[in-house]
From Swiss-Prot:
Residues 175-177, 330-331 are annotated as: Interaction with tRNA. It comes from the Bacteria. Keywords: ATP-binding, Cytoplasm, Disulfide bond, Nucleotide-binding, RNA-binding, Transferase, tRNA processing, tRNA-binding. It comes from Prochlorococcus marinus (strain MIT 9515). The record marks 142, 368 as: Interaction with tRNA. One of its GO terms (cellular component) is cytoplasm. This is tRNA-specific 2-thiouridylase MnmA. It catalyses: S-sulfanyl-L-cysteinyl-[protein] + uridine(34) in tRNA + AH2 + ATP = 2-thiouridine(34) in tRNA + L-cysteinyl-[protein] + A + AMP + diphosphate + H(+). Belongs to the MnmA/TRMU family.
Amino acid sequence: MLKTLKDKKLENCSSINNKSKKQKHIVVGLSGGVDSSLSAALLMEDGWKVEGLTLWLMKGEGSCCSEGLVDAAGLCEDLGIQHNILDSRVIFEREVIKKTTEGYESGYTPLPCSMCNKNVKFEEMLKFVIKQKEFTYIATGHYARVIKSSCEHINNSENFQFKDFLLLRGADRNKDQSYFLYSLSQEVLSRLILPLGDLKKEETRKEALRLGLRTAKKPESQDLCLVEHYGSMQKFIDNHVKTKNGEIKHINGKTLGTHNGIQHFTIGQRKGLGIAWPEPLYVESLDKQKNIVYVANKNDLLKREAIIKEVNWVSIEAPIKEIEVEAQIRYRSEPVKGILVPLKSKDNLTKRFKLIFEDNQSSVTPGQAAVFYKGEILLGGGLISEFSKK
């Protein structure tokens, strides 16, 4: 049966509870993998009327998405549910392929999964549900949780202005995917069910085997869909980003070599620089205007501050004064303490914030997401646009 939160204090706060499942239609986003497959099966077992929805994202036959479509269709046939396919290739091309390309051309290291979640996956699912009318909720196989902010057991010692629904980390910290969901809206959260939020990965496999799902033994995907489609991120870059030769310089100004495009480098990179130096050097920054890759010693990668743009406050109202947060600046990194300071713009809207780390951080990478937490609650997040020295 579908689990709610293991923390009994929060059990009645789950967005699953108190929603009458009788005659409630739910659309499950199916990728063809075990996580989304199990989500659909568990919801059915728990009494929901389920249909599957697969987004057709990639152009060309034989792509990862084509394989996913086949697996998702087979799963729906096994479960005896309707399988819907939504052609989202145009919007995916515009919002993910194009913007990822532009990011690399600008000297950033983009985060395609975040782009897809923000502008494609959840928006397309929401539009589908609203258009069909008989559907009420959407579900995915993400390892994260949604609860109601009215829960009396929520700790709000900082007096945040909580919105109606809160996004929480998944119970399995090793699989937690909330980092990629920071851009979701309250409209999405109000309809979103995450059946795997309280499961560990090993439990997912066991449940899939128990239910006899065809995807139960399917290998877990370790790559972005772009990587699976093109073979590697390098091949994607070669296919989409124009090459422009430039210099590799030490931050002291000495020219050490040349490169064939800043898109081939990312902050903190050590391998593949093709330069000689008495000690290891790392990519310290990328200057798009001058087309220069700057390298430095490891200690020079440490940064004290970063500017975060396009901030979305998913669980709280935008703060008007500085707040203390736990910031996660890479998917697999541990959150670090910091202070977030609002920066006013010309239109007096606060979409940019200065993040001041308690301890200097290495490899602060423009284009990646900085996501802000308070304990298990994801407050919001945005994109790293620039950083300052120690």
